[in-house]
């Protein structure tokens, strides 16, 4: 991602940033202070930082040897995807895993960060409203930006999609311009100016900025600013709506994409097992009870779905959840069958048994100090511990036909969720999840965490999404990109209706903002206790990969930028792109060696 490019960062500053906010495998790119026009790749290796020089010859990018690439983005993508290629002279493998992104240049929601021109066109054309616009990063020139605007004219002729105009925004000396004499202090100032005046294309036609296309992606470390933006009221003809309402309404409209089959829950023999007749599990992700008589229709049914963070790679995510409805009298035995077959060791209950006089969940555990039989299993409640926010029960479960096989299960019941709405502040929920995760991580062979409320979608979805986002940030670092709306869409594709209300949607934002703030403070304390020292790394290439891949040429770039519609003169930076610095290059060719 181009947002790993930090235009104003020195080597010592890069080390401080990577050690203070990154994790092993975090990396960033920055301009070289030694050779103008070159770049440096700074990578955290365990607790240290190594710096790799990147040559920009004017025709290609490389590491003073090895593969050659058309763009800086392609070079970084290659070494990110081809793990094990880079190593220090001492043989230490240098892994590029997690981009440490720079802060967004603006908190405005029309800023989309790292998307390609093609992706921008797809978004704007799907919107279909002429003069809708967004701002994104330039893939071809790190540190610059692109203003993409949907025109009012078809791209190729009648019936074709509307044309999208891409206008490059250069950043020079901390000021922004589309060319010519007009410069601005910020992207926001530039956009606000051209919203009033329009932008004249080379053809003489004007491009207008009338309707922003809002993004939901945000740099995790900047989420507090996004919360402030979303809290702002947007004036309309009849009422003022905040950004949270807009985002949640947009999310609700996309539910039509999740029309997966729910046939098992609709079968007559299973209707009595559903707490709410229309809240049913998707067939493709439902938990199927094992060891049941196939001659008994519906015997393998329970209203529960597997949920996984599909936005993380398989090597980044080891956690699976089961989102379930609260137990009915008729489903308690099935619930314990599910817990046993899945080897679940942690159960999270986010409701009281009765709230406002309404039954939310049948108690499916015995009283403390007692034992009960549930179907094929014996369950003992050996201990209960009360805290200000939740109750922890320590349970033992064993099959009736093998009493010597005993598993311990920790049952966390959150008691501080109000009957309506959400908690007034997220600290209690974050502490609750921290305890749950510590327990789960202490059990290396434990199965999925079962999470339930009453219907198994509202509070359940909120808790799961918060935990997923916390895990992503903990894995990738504070400066990773997160997308709360996209995360909810992803879990809704696995269980219908997850995260039910705008209040729950906003609570996720507020919870993650507090998690980020707390994590920053912890990292500052840790970093203040560590020393810092590093130097430029000397990179070698393992023999097996020295020439295993074809070299990329300038003409083979995957990131072909669109024709930019800028008028006026070229920027000074563009005029310098093709200049050679052969004398400087010769001095640095010794910084890499082949094994």
Swiss-Prot record:
There is a cross-link at residue 308 (Glycyl lysine isopeptide (Lys-Gly) (interchain with G-Cter in ubiquitin)). It is an enzyme of class 3 (hydrolase). GO terms for molecular function: cell adhesion molecule binding; phosphorylation-dependent protein binding; phosphotyrosine residue binding; protein kinase binding; protein tyrosine phosphatase activity; SH2 domain binding; SH3 domain binding; transmembrane receptor protein tyrosine phosphatase activity. The active site is at residue 453. The modification Phosphothreonine is found at residue 394. The lineage of its organism: Eukaryota, Metazoa, Chordata, Craniata, Vertebrata. Substrate binds at residues 419, 453-459, 500. This is Tyrosine-protein phosphatase non-receptor type 6. Pfam families: SH2 (PF00017), Y_phosphatase (PF00102). Residues 4-100, 110-213 form the SH2 domain.
């Amino acid at each position: 991602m181009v947002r790993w490019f930090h235009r104003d960062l020195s080597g010592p500053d890069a080390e401080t940033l990577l050690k203070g906010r990154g994790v092993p495998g975090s990396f960033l790119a920055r301009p070289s202070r030694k050779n103008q026009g070159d770049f440096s790749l700074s990578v955290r290796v365990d607790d240290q930082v190594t710096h790799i020089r990147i040559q920009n010859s004017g025709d290609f990018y490389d590491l003073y040897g090895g593969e050659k690439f058309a763009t800086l983005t392609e070079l970084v993508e290659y070494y990110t995807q081809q793990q094990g290629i880079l190593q220090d002279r001492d043989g230490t493998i240098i892994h590029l895993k997690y981009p440490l992104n720079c802060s967004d240049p603006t908190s405005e929601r029309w800023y989309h960060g790292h998307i390609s021109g093609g992706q921008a066109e797809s978004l704007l054309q799907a919107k279909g409203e002429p003069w809708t616009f967004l701002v994104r990063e330039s893939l071809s020139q790190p540190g610059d930006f692109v203003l993409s605007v949907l025109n009012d004219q078809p791209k190729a002729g009648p019936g074709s999609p509307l044309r999208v105009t891409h206008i490059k925004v250069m950043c020079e000396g901390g000021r922004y311009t589309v060319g010519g004499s007009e410069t601005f202090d910020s992207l926001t100032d530039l956009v606000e100016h051209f919203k009033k005046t329009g932008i004249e294309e080379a053809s003489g036609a004007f491009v207008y900025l009338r309707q922003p296309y809002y993004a939901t992606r945000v740099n995790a470390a900047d989420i507090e600013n996004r919360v402030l933006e979303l809290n702002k009221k947007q004036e309309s003809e009849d009422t003022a709506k905040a950004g949270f309402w807009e985002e949640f309404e947009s999310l609700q409209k996309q539910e039509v994409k999740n029309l997966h089959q729910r046939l098992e829950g609709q079968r007559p023999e299973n209707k009595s097992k559903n707490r709410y007749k229309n809240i049913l599990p998707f067939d493709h992700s439902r938990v199927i009870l094992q060891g049941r008589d196939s001659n008994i229709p519906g015997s393998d049914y329970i209203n529960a779905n597997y949920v996984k963070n599909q936005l993380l790679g398989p090597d980044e995510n080891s956690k699976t959840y089961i989102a379930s409805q609260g137990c009915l009298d008729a489903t308690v035995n099935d619930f314990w069958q599910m817990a046993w077959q899945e080897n679940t060791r942690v159960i999270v209950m986010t409701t009281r048994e009765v709230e406002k006089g309404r039954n939310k969940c049948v108690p499916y555990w015995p009283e403390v100090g007692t034992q009960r039989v549930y179907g094929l299993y014996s369950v003992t409640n050996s201990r209960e511990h009360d805290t200000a926010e939740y109750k922890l029960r320590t349970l033992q479960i064993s099959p009736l036909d093998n009493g010597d096989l005993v598993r311990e299960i920790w049952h966390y019941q959150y008691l501080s969720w109000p009957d309506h709405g959400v908690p007034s502040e997220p600290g209690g929920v974050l502490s609750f999840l921290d305890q749950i995760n510590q327990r789960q991580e202490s059990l290396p062979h434990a199965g999925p965490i079962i999470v339930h409320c009453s219907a198994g979608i509202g509070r359940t979805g909120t808790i799961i999404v918060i935990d997923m986002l916390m895990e992503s940030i903990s894995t990738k670092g504070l400066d990773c990109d997160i997308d709360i709306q996209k995360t909810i869409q992803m879990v809704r594709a696995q269980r219908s209706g997850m995260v039910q209300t705008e209040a729950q949607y906003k609570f996720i934002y507020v919870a993650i903002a507090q998690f980020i703030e707390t994590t920053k403070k912890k990292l500052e304390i840790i970093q203040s206790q560590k020393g810092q020292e590093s130097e430029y790394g000397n990179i070698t290439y393992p023999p097996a990969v020295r020439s295993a891949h074809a070299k990329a040429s300038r003409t083979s770039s995957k990131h072909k930028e669109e024709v930019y519609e800028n008028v006026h003169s070229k920027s000074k930076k563009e005029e310098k792109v093709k200049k050679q610095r052969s004398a400087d290059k010769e001095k640095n060719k010794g910084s890499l060696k082949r094994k």
